[in-house]
Swiss-Prot record:
Protein name in UniProt: Uncharacterized protein RC0076
Entry's transmembrane regions: none
Signal peptide bounds: 1-21
Lineage: Bacteria, Pseudomonadati, Pseudomonadota, Alphaproteobacteria, Rickettsiales
Keyword Signal found: yes
Length: 186
């Protein structure tokens, strides 16, 4: 009986998605899309030096790409996006997010020979508000301190599990200003 419920629920979910797509002309009518290849030379590459771990927030997609270019990493990084970026690695509610990050690092070391991790958190992050609480973020100083503590904890976890990798941590404002968060000496 349980199997039947799952099948029915799965059918309803798929039907709902199809109904949404049918009502969304921009997506529903696109059977095949040709996307212009901007970097033909990338087809032959099989390495990327860096894994960027950033938040899923749509507000900073372009700024994130610009940062990676300014860091000299354009066309030289893989990317994982999860709510909260570094918070995804250490939060107690969604522990599988941390496992996802660790598994991704493991496979990308083999696939793309990554040598470093860049964590990119951002200010006014909804995941931070939900998972650590608004009261810990209600001033710029508190917000910076909360991100710095979590970024440094994430750095420690990565260094312990993947000691051969360099880890860099950054905090981006919604205005595009990016601060590097340095390791707190023990």
């Amino acid at each position: 009986m349980i199997h039947v419920k799952y099948i029915i629920l799965g059918f309803i979910m798929v039907s709902s998605l199809n109904l949404y797509a049918a009502n969304n002309d921009i997506i529903a009518n696109k059977k095949v899309v040709k996307v212009e290849v901007s970097n033909e030379h990338l087809k032959t590459l099989n390495e990327a030096s860096t894994l960027l771990i950033s938040c899923v927030d749509f507000r900073l997609i372009d700024e994130t790409d610009k940062l990676m270019k300014q860091l000299g990493l354009e066309d030289n990084f893989d990317k994982v996006s999860l709510p909260g970026a570094s918070l995804a690695l250490i939060n107690d509610k969604y522990t599988y997010w941390g496992k996802t990050i660790e598994d991704t690092i493991e496979i990308l070391q083999e696939l793309h020979n990554i040598k470093q991790i860049v964590f990119l958190d951002h200010r006014e992050c909804g995941a931070y508000k939900i998972l650590i609480g608004q009261e810990q973020l209600n001033t710029k100083e508190k917000e910076t301190a909360a991100h710095a503590a979590i970024l440094n904890k994430a750095r420690d976890i990565i260094k312990e599990k993947f000691p051969q990798l360099k880890v860099y941590t950054f905090l981006m404002g919604l205005d595009g200003v990016v601060e590097q968060i340095y390791e707190i000496p023990s």
